[in-house]
């Protein structure tokens, strides 16, 4: 059985870990980094992922996608998506089913399809380390992700060629990473997770007793559209406003300028975590009729803090709700763990310290803890990690729409999963022959104010006065937090059941097609690599041949030289095209045309070899004239 890997699929960065010798190990990617930017770029002939994609973003802003996780499982008309539509350099569009998709070079793509490219890189990183194919993974999601977003994440895994064995909440994974070596006692831990695009707070009880450990999530809360990207955007808007005040030009209309501004803002934000002032200096950011324009703005830490103060305050309300849901007070919390890169900001740490009245722990790596926890959970599933029990919860209440457009809850938020719940409902009208089961997720009483997860009909109900038929609705949430619903007419036994697919979401056929496309691209990628290899070999041969022609000088007959030069030109023409066979044919012809060169090189080598041999013989002859002798020390008393 192959290894199950743990993947933290992040908004800004992603990370992969695997159990190695019983310990979770974070793996380095091909660039030598332990985290990979969650950035994907599409060019004319290839898909670029990670750091290389980030490097080319300035020159290709419309086809470079970042923070795709903020769109996964979302409707185009969602307020959160509409905010992003206006600030992202790439195109966010409405799919036929109402989902938020993206567009690159005329191709419309679903967020799971784009995210799958990051997962493929994580998969390849693990395969390079393990030396074997990887087909199974545990993938983390924000604790406050709804059913649609969890389904979409599983779809991304399938498209990447991974069977997702478990979806695990990010704060829970971080608690696993922190608590796995804490062998005794009972601790209540608050995990404050402020990442690139999402915010979660989870209150988790870790019970360690005689080698057995239980990680029980008591409550969770959060905001799936609040994170480091929002902090960056505040700074980007400030810089754009300052430039407009000074120069009268709006950089927001220039995608290239905005991409440079994004990189500079992110860099400045990071620098201001360790220094009190920094300067954003972007020469030639744009130009008008009067000439090029430069952006130079000094930013203090205090200025940045004032720009994002309300975002930090927004994270505190979910803390209060989570504590209330867990029926705990601040004094009951033993440890506070910070997860996510944005928690490196001193003002965030200060806010958390003030709220909990204690310093957060500094021994948890905020960028790697989630992937480490995912790898530990993978070990639990594969049987490599024993005596660990993980009890997670559903973050939002689940129910159905009943008469008067009311949401009737069947499963309350923060219920431990997996779980089942059932309730009997009836008809609203006389002789009603069918009922529509409309499944909802959320906390509001009004049905329309909650997230619609989908609906289905149970028909064939026997005619009867209203209120008489008995329809039993069963909700079943699996360990991934994904919902299965059934409805049964208790009189006839007729049953209808579905795994909730979001009313949006990808259909089975769409996912299957994307899997096929990914496999086809894998073949294309392989061919592209082979083409590049052939090009590189051809270029290397031309370079070496030119050098040999120069070294041969007049020893190379003119007609041979002409043949070689013609063959080199043919190779150079072939390498500009995309025909691997043509490149290899031209390369072979150059090798054959260079036969005379090889003869000259061999003759020269033999001549040099002969000269060296003669010199060696002369040296040996001189050495033969030397007589070895043993010297005896003569003592004074022997004289």
Curated annotation (Swiss-Prot):
UniProt key word Phosphoprotein: yes
Gene3D superfamilies in the record: 1.20.1270.10, 3.30.420.40, Actin, Chain A, domain 4, Substrate Binding Domain Of DNAk, Chain A, domain 1
One Pfam entry name: HSP70
Record-listed Phosphothreonine modification sites: 198
Disulfide bridge map: none
Acidic residues compositional bias, start-end: 625-639
InterPro entries: ATPase_NBD, Chaperone_DnaK, Heat_shock_70_CS, HSP70_C_sf, HSP70_peptide-bd_sf, Hsp_70_fam
PANTHER family: HEAT SHOCK PROTEIN 70KDA
Listed name of the protein: Chaperone protein DnaK
């Amino acid at each position: 059985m192959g290894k199950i890997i743990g993947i933290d699929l992040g908004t800004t960065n992603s990370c992969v870990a695997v159990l190695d010798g019983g310990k979770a190990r974070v793996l380095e990617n091909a660039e030598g980094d332990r985290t990979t930017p969650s950035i994907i770029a599409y060019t004319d002939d290839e898909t670029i992922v990670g750091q290389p994609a980030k490097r080319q973003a300035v020159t290709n802003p419309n086809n470079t996608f970042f923070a795709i996780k903020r769109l996964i499982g979302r409707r185009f008309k969602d307020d959160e998506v509409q905010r992003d539509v206006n600030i992202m350099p790439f195109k966010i569009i409405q799919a036929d089913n109402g989902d938020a998709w993206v567009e690159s070079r005329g191709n419309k793509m679903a967020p799971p399809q784009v995210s799958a490219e990051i997962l493929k890189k994580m998969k390849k990183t693990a395969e390079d380390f393990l030396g074997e194919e990887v087909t199974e993974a545990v993938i983390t999601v924000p604790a406050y992700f709804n059913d649609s977003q969890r389904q979409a994440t599983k779809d991304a895994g399938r498209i990447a060629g991974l069977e997702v064995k478990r979806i695990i909440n990010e704060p829970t994974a971080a608690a696993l990473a922190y608590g796995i070596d804490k062998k005794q006692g009972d601790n209540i831990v608050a995990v404050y997770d402020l990442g690139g695009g999402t915010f979660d707070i989870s209150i988790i009880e870790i019970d360690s007793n005689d080698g057995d450990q239980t990680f029980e999530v008591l409550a969770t809360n959060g905001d799936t559209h609040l994170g480091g990207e929002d902090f960056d955007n505040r700074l980007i808007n400030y810089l754009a406003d300052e430039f407009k005040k000074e120069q009268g030009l709006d950089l927001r209309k220039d995608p290239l300028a905005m991409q440079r501004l994004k990189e500079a803002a992110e860099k400045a934000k990071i620098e201001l975590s360790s220094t009190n002032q920094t300067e954003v200096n972007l020469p030639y950011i744009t130009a008008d009729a009067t000439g090029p324009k430069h952006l130079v703005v000094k930013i203090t830490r205090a200025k940045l803090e004032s720009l994002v103060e309300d975002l930090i305050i927004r994270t505190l309300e979910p803390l209060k709700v989570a504590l209330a849901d867990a029926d705990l007070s601040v004094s009951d919390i033993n440890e506070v763990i910070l997860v996510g890169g944005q928690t490196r900001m001193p003002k965030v740490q200060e806010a958390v310290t003030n709220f909990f009245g204690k310093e957060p722990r500094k021994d948890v790596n905020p960028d790697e803890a989630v992937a480490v926890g995912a790898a530990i959970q993978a070990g639990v599933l594969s049987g490599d990690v024993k005596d660990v029990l993980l009890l997670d919860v559903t973050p939002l209440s689940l129910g159905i729409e009943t008469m008067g457009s009311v949401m009737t809850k069947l499963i309350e938020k923060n219920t431990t999963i997996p779980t089942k719940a059932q309730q009997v409902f009836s008809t609203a009208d006389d002789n009603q022959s069918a009922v529509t089961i409309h499944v909802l997720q959320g906390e509001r009483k009004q049905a329309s104010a909650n997230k619609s997860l989908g609906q289905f009909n149970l028909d064939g109900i026997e005619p009867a006065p209203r209120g008489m038929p008995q329809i039993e609705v069963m909700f079943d949430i699996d360990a991934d937090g994904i919902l299965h619903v059934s409805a049964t007419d208790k009189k006839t036994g007729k049953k209808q059941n579905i795994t909730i697919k979001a009313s949006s979401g990808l259909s089975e056929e769409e996912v299957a097609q994307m899997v096929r496309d990914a496999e086809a691209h894998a073949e294309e990628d392989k061919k592209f690599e082979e083409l590049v290899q052939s090009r590189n070999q051809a270029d290397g041969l031309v370079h070496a041949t030119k050098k040999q022609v120069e070294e041969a000088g007049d020893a190379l007959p003119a007609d041979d030289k002409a043949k070689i030069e013609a063959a080199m030109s043919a190779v150079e023409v072939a390498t500009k095209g995309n025909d691997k066979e043509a490149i290899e044919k031209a390369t072979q012809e150059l090798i054959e045309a260079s036969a005379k060169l090889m003869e000259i090189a061999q003759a020269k080598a033999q001549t040099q070899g002969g000269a060296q041999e003669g010199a060696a013989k002369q040296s040996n002859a001189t050495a033969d004239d030397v007589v070895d002798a043993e010297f005896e020390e003569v003592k004074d008393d022997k004289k």
